[in-house]
Amino acid sequence: MDLGDNELTLTPIPGKSGKAYMGSYPDGKRIFVKMNTSPILPGLAREQIAPQLLWSRRLADGRDMCAQEWLTGKILTPYDMNRKQIVNILTRLHRSRPLMTQLSRLGYAMETPVDLLQSWQETAPDALRKNHFISEVMADLRQTIPGFREDHATIVHGDVRHSNWIETDSGLIYLVDWDSVRLTDRMFDVAHMLCHYISEHQWKEWLTYYGYKYNQTVLSKLYWYGQLSYLSQISKYYMNQDLENVNREIHGLRHFRDKYGKRR
């Protein structure tokens, strides 16, 4: 894909829904290019949460194109996800009033737990919504809606799986792919982290370091949002036709419910 602009050539990056590219110039310089990404990228870069934004422009076909610095490093693995740097980045994100204000001005609405369930129901593929096990999970979630205070809502990333974290060769860690950003309870991100990557015996330390109290109220909310995080991943993998990870997430959700369901 050649834009004919400053001789920038775009090469699609596999696995990014056709919206991400490696941009290259004749002199060998490389950049990361994303189509129709979140307009809050400059703010995220200022907070050192996301890579630096180099430029953005509107294409003739109406799409927005943003360029970020090309990072030399690696994508984190599940075994990397217990680092304190990651907790610090999430804390910085969730406590950022400027980013939350910017999202509000862009028209993002506050989402309650009920809204989150409704959003999943409206966007999930029919095959998932009709699945007996998933229908059972959704019914349980509707019966156990956690408390929610709008004045405690924060900006959340919405998809903190390990493949959305990048560590540079210099040791900096960035959170990328902001297509799922929303305004809701910070537990949306926290529960995904804990139920997918952090051993139960480390939950108290992790939550305390983040800033939570470790009590039954928090654990009940963790159980609710943890299930929602599995449903979210199942839906995303299914829509990308990644059935191996769909099955892995369903297995994880079954195990999570079997292990923690009686402790609510």
Swiss-Prot record:
Q: What happens when the gene is disrupted?
A: Dramatic reduction of growth rate and loss of nucleoid. Slight decrease in cell length and cell area. Cells form multiple, often incomplete, septa, and FtsZ and Z-rings are mislocalized, with the presence of several aberrant Z-rings in 43% of the cells. Cells have defective DNA content and they have either no DNA at all or chromosomes are cut during septum closure. In many cells, the chromosome is localized at only one half of the cell.
The family database entries (InterPro entries) matched by this protein are listed as: Aminoglycoside_PTrfase, CcrZ_PhaseVar_Mediator, Kinase-like_dom_sf
Q: Where is this motif: APH?
A: 173-196
Write out the residues that bind ATP: F32, W70, G73
Task: Give any Gene Ontology cellular component.
Answer: cytoplasm
**Which example biological process does GO assign this protein?**
DNA damage response
Question: Gene3D superfamilies, alphabetically?
Answer: 3.90.1200.10
Domain of life according to the entry? Bacteria
Where is this protein chiefly located? cytoplasm
Catalyzed reactions per annotation? D-ribose + ATP = D-ribose 5-phosphate + ADP + H(+); 2-deoxy-D-ribose + ATP = 2-deoxy-D-ribose 5-phosphate + ADP + H(+)
Molecular function (GO) terms for this protein are: ATP binding; carbohydrate kinase activity; phosphotransferase activity, alcohol group as acceptor; ribokinase activity
User: What is stated as this protein's family in its record?
Assistant: Belongs to the aminoglycoside phosphotransferase family.
The protein's name is: Cell cycle regulator CcrZ
Species in which this protein is naturally found: Streptococcus pneumoniae serotype 2 (strain D39 / NCTC 7466)
Q: Which gene encodes it?
A: ccrZ
